[in-house]
Amino acid sequence: MKNTPNRYLIIALLIGVVFHGFGIFFTLEGTYDALIHLFFADHYASHWFEPWNYSWYTGFTVMGYPPLVHQAIAILSLIGGLKFGMFTVAIIGVILFITGVYRFALLITASAHAAGYAAILAVFSSSFVETLHIFGQLPSIIGVSILMHALPEIYLWLTSGKKKYFLTSLSLLAVTVCSHHVTPIFGMVFFIFPLIGMAVMDEARTRVNTMKEITFPVFLKAFFRLLKRMIAFGISALFLIIVCILPYWINTKNNPITQVPIPHGSRDNFLEITSSGLVFFLIPWGILLLLMPYFFYRYYSKRYLFFGLSLTMLTILGTGGTTPIPKIILGDNAFNILTLDRFTLWGSIMVLPLFGEFAYRFAEGDYKTFLSTKLGGLYHRILAGILAGLFLGTTVFTMTLNNFRPSQPDPINMLPIVNFLNQDQHYKWRFLPLGFGDQIAWLSAQTDAMTVDGNYHSARRLPELTSRAIERLENSKFRGVEGIGSLQQFLTVPEKYNLKYVFSND
């Protein structure tokens, strides 16, 4: 029996690598963000120590994004090219996510069986499938996965005080910071702070006979006993967050985002724009919505109280503009800059340990015994089949969503365009792609030619772009007179931007 939990994890890893490793060859290049990260990787592969990239927006600094994932793709590209590096990092992300969920679940539930179930369920998590196969957010996946690996180390440092856990927790946190800037900042609030609260609860529990005997004075005494360790970790973590991506903070200070907010579906009112509600709320939560009462009931028990508060906050923030609450909490500036689907992603990840616990109890534990006794084994199996069908059905639907509702134009043959730009010194002039979608990043990665447009909107500095609520110039047609006016500024005076060629796929 001792090997069973490890067998669950091994099964999860094998299924995850095969399922996602096979799937990404059909989905990853058609996602929103994957090719953008490939473009950044191309920059590091060509000019590792150059902080500026001149391919987009008449020049921008790559210091506006933590470099680890991009640099990893760049290094791997030396073996098999940029796409090889991108696919390899994606598979590494899958492995890190599954093992991260296992360790996080083991920390929360203290049950290797439940953690094993959580790891298997993580493979088919609709929020993870969407993040990887629809959004292509590789840094987010790597960042949150490493953060989950860091949580047990942080807990062990707080409860045991052993220096090796202090060093491992900070090392993993440093990797998280270098992977994705938003994850450690909000991870401190939504994951690490609740973890500290749970550690204090466990410390208080050692001084009493039962959890019911933990009162506020008992909790407060335990808090002060761990205070030195918390302060040591907090100061060190803050130091790492600042130092590890210091160029990012300097760039943020010198070049704050002042552009007109670009609309994003995660900020919509999901009751009015149901398509946004489907993509940014129903799909990532999936079948987990049916089990929300169980998750809140468990997380609002005394030991997990702070995780319950965190889950509540994440759930509310993930509703976007459906209610005014997220905007009140975040403030106008953060609300208009952040994409709020990240909160739903983190919320769905936070409940995975309890989802694994529920699945274990339902498949092998007390829930199975109760249902089999009350209703009979047949009804238990039917109910299990329905739940499994809904869960896997949501996964398959999410995986194939782009087939029903394409988010990108059909794949474009870049070779003729690349050949044209690379011959007769055409690359000395700027070009403007229209109707390319996110494939603009793949085109830019294959040529030295520059474009007035781009696909990393936070880096834009041209007033002609920052004064309009459009992502790329090709989207100007959707913004009426305002959008067309932005495009006209480039087409009527192209010499101002050294613009000579327009490639239209629209």
How should each PLM-predicted stretch be described?
Residues 1-421, 442-447, 456, 493, ...:
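Membrane-embedded transmembrane-helix bundle of lipid-linked glycan/lipid transferases
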Residues 96, 412, 434-435, 485:
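Residue-level recognition of alpha-helix initiation/capping sites
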